[in-house]
Amino acid sequence: MKWIFKQAQGRLKIIIICFMLYGLAILIRLFYVQIAQHEELTELAKANWDREIPFQEERGDITDRNGEAIVTNKLAPTLYFMRAQNDNVEEVADQLAPLLKTDREKLLEKLSRRAYLTKLAPEGKNITAEQAEQVQQLQIDGLYSGVDYVRHYPYGTLLSRLLGFTGYDSQGLAGIEYEYNDVLTGQGSAIRLFTDAKGNAMRQTPDEWRQGEGGATIELTVDVRLQQVVERELAQAMEKYSAEQALALAMNPKTGEILAISSYPTYDPTTYQKVEPSIYNRNLPVFMTYEPGSTFKIITLSAAIEEDVIDLENESFYDQGFTMVEGSRLRCWKRQGHGHQTFLEVVENSCNPGFIEMGHRIGSDKLLSYIHKFGFGEKTGSNLAGEASGILFSKEGFGPVESATTAFGQGVSVTPIQQVQAVAAAINGGTLYTPYIVSRMIGSNGQVLLENKPSAKRQVISEETSKKVREALESVVANGSGKHAYRDGLRVGGKTGTAQKVENGRYKDGDYIVSFIGFAPANDPEILVYVAVDSPQAQSVFGSTITAPIVGQIIEESASILGLPYSSDQLPKKYVWGDEVTEAMPDFIGQKGSEVMEQQYTYRIEWHGKGDKIIDQLPVAGKQIKQDEIIHLYLGN
């Protein structure tokens, strides 16, 4: 009996211990849930009650090098409807449909949904500020307005093929907007509304605000003032010559900073749906590949001087209009030939046989090596979307004929940005720089997230060779085929290009891409400008007559924008019969009108206003004016 009692007592202890352990476990669990998991479980509970009204944070701006906004944002709210808070959807539809200019029945279908929160899109997405104010005045229960933005392009079509655009959900779809979408996109804010199962507001739980963060600003290397000049000139060329397309690229040859970049035709980023994808998907200065023509001769010239195989001023070359290479007759653009010339005159006249001779003296292997050193056959590293690599001959396929045609820019395929990168190296002292367009990325808090600096790839030619190349190309503008780029007071150097277009492996008769690449000041270049016009319709289709004047005008106007120095020791222009004689417009502002009236000028003056001093003038100082042209001077006190 005693044994049975002890056995029962032992079992009772075990049961009591088990109950105590179970109770302790419950206490521990309660502590864990009530204290340790309090915030987590509260958030889970709130998730069943809350509905978020998103407030989009602003997408980052895109600015030029001077901080001028070229892409920004415009407030465009979006409407949300909570059906549980307003059952009178018929009346809501009657009020909203005319205001939103949408079909009442389609809107009613959205308003009638049993979802806790319905986004009224597309009808109520990105409404105008005026519409938002009208909605606010209606005081409709259950209707909420969420902050939203759309992209705003204050300069319209300017830079559109570089910048790209955003889509319906503010995501970048092309250009810079696409390439740097993650940088530009911010993290949105939101209001959390707490409701019961029926959608009624829970008054004991206050609404919450979740703060987001705006996107970063991207500062480009371009100057919007120069960009406006470039795009104006391209637009005029397109209209004047009924061209298929045109492009331009301006760069600081000492750093690789892209100062302007343009492609025509252009488009409005806010209505991109109206144009073909080939317009907004192709940034021509990096995408387009073609035979460069005579602008490529700068590479041959640089290699020939570096290898010391020519003497520009003291050595003569005879051009009979063609030269024979392994049975192939390679002609000069001037059928009758240029006759006896120095090699400097070969450069001035853009004489094909003369450049073939330079290439022959350099040698095929070395010429091909220089072409690669100058960056051809590979992407420049600009990080611009859609950049092509171009096409070069392989070493095995680079025979005497291929070497000869390459020497004057035929038979190879390059991009405009490759040409600009290479010519920059030829004139800046011999250093090949990586072109770049993004200067800085700046966070919404003002912190600089990234800052790009000039990146030198390699030394291609010596400073002495580069100086001789600059001098030769300045002579091209003063005395040779580039004379239409000449500007009094500005030392301009450059080279023309006229390349026959290729289709299905054959050259097309009468169809050309004409180009000109120019720089200033010629003794210390600060800007390099390349312009190409595709299939211009004109009697004289040459880079010398079509694109050289365009580049000259861009460089002339860039002088005041970039502060280029004027010089009195430039090479004098060699005038020939038929050339228009021009001179630079003086700076009359601040002078006394009576003193100016006493002088004699080759142009006519038209006076405006009253006063003692000249307060304004047209054209601006430095602009080229013709003899007998009318200028306008404005008097004031």
What are these regions (language model features)?
Residues 1-273, 365-377, 386, 485-488, ...:
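Periplasmic/cell-envelope proteins involved in peptidoglycan metabolism and beta-lactam response
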Residues 57, 86-91, 122-129, 170-174, ...:
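Soluble non-cytosolic domains of exported or imported proteins
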Residues 71, 196-207, 248-294, 299-533:
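Beta-lactam-recognizing serine transpeptidase/beta-lactamase-like catalytic domain environment
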Residues 124-138, 144-161, 165, 216-217, ...:
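Conserved SxxK-family serine transpeptidase/carboxypeptidase catalytic domain
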Residues 605-625:
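BRCT (BRCA1 C-terminal) domain core and associated BRCT-interaction motifs
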Residues 625-637:
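Conserved "repeat-terminator" motif of extracellular CCP/Sushi domains
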